[in-house]
UniProtKB/Swiss-Prot annotation:
This is Small ribosomal subunit protein uS11c. GO terms for biological process: translation. Disulfide bonds: none annotated. Its main location: plastid. It comes from Oenothera argillicola. Part of the 30S ribosomal subunit. The keyword Ligase does not apply. The gene is rps11. It is found in: Plastid, Chloroplast. One of its GO terms (cellular component) is ribosome. Pfam families: Ribosomal_S11. Keywords: Chloroplast, Plastid, Ribonucleoprotein, Ribosomal protein, RNA-binding, rRNA-binding. One of its GO terms (molecular function) is structural constituent of ribosome.
Length: 144
């Protein structure tokens, strides 16, 4: 018994239905609470939004927002990156979030200001910058 080959039109409809199912599942996911990670170095700022379990929902950095070279480390670049990462999450219905800030960069406060302005209620703001308890020897001092 030979299998019948489906027509081209039927194959196209099946493929479209499969793609529509994938897309719809992504957009209908409601996330009421999440965690916003801000990693601010002197050269760049990366903002990642995750759900409570740690799965990444959206992310952005100063580099992906179009800033290059030394401009990536500026507070304005951090503010733009934070707004860019939070916009799709607010559309998905996030109302409350916890903020975790890591690093010594200039973009720490600017990113936090942008998060506050987005309308998400912040349950807590935590500084998770790693500090050594006299661990590795630091590099030698720079002589210019």
């Amino acid at each position: 018994m030979a299998k019948s080959i489906p027509s081209a039109g039927l194959r196209l409809r099946l493929r479209l239905r499969r793609n529509a199912r994938r897309r719809s599942r992504k957009s209908t996911r409601k996330i009421p609470k999440g965690v916003i990670h801000v990693q601010a170095s002197f050269h760049n700022t990366i903002v990642t939004v995750t759900d409570v379990r740690g799965r990444v929902i959206s992310w952005s950095s100063a580099g992906t927002c179009g800033f290059k070279s030394t401009r990536k480390g500026t507070p304005f670049a951090a503010q733009t990156a934070a707004g860019d990462a939070i916009r799709p999450v607010v559309d998905q219905g996030m109302q409350r979030a916890e903020v975790r800030i890591k690093g010594p960069g200039l973009g720490r406060d600017a990113a936090l200001r942008a998060i506050r302005r987005s309308g998400i209620r912040l349950s807590c703001i935590r500084d998770v910058t790693p500090l050594p308890h006299n661990g590795c020897r630091p590099p030698k001092k720079r002589r210019v």
